[in-house]
Amino acid sequence: MISNYEPLLLLVITCCVLLFNFTISSKTKIDIIFAVQTIVFIWFIFHFVYSAI
């Protein structure tokens, strides 16, 4: 379900990502990507285990 604020939220996130893409170093980008992937993977594992129990 798409709410009224979601396109604005996506636009703000996209603008922030583009801004950070030019301002932060490559090592920091890799660290951020690794942290986000780790959080998503842990959430997926907990969600899978919870739904299997």
Curated annotation (Swiss-Prot):
Organism annotation: Monkeypox virus
Induction of its expression: Expressed in the late phase of the viral replicative cycle.
Classification lineage: Viruses, Varidnaviria, Bamfordvirae, Nucleocytoviricota, Pokkesviricetes
Cell location: Virion membrane
Alphabetical UniProt keywords: ATP-binding, DNA-binding, Helicase, Hydrolase, Late protein, Membrane, Nucleotide-binding, Phosphoprotein, Transcription, Transcription regulation, Transcription termination, Transmembrane, Transmembrane helix, Virion
Family: Belongs to the orthopoxvirus OPG141 protein family.
Transmembrane segments: 5-25, 30-50
Any one GO biological process: DNA-templated transcription termination
PTM: Not phosphorylated.
Chief localisation class: virion
Keyword flag Nucleotide-binding: yes
Matching Pfam families: DUF1029 (PF06269)
Its job: Protein probably involved in counteracting host defense, since it enhances virulence in vivo.
Keyword Transcription in annotation: yes
Membrane topology: Multi-pass membrane protein
InterPro entries: Poxvirus_A14.5
GO cellular component terms given for this protein: membrane; virion membrane
Molecular-function GO term, any one: ATP binding
Protein name per its UniProtKB record: Virion membrane protein OPG141
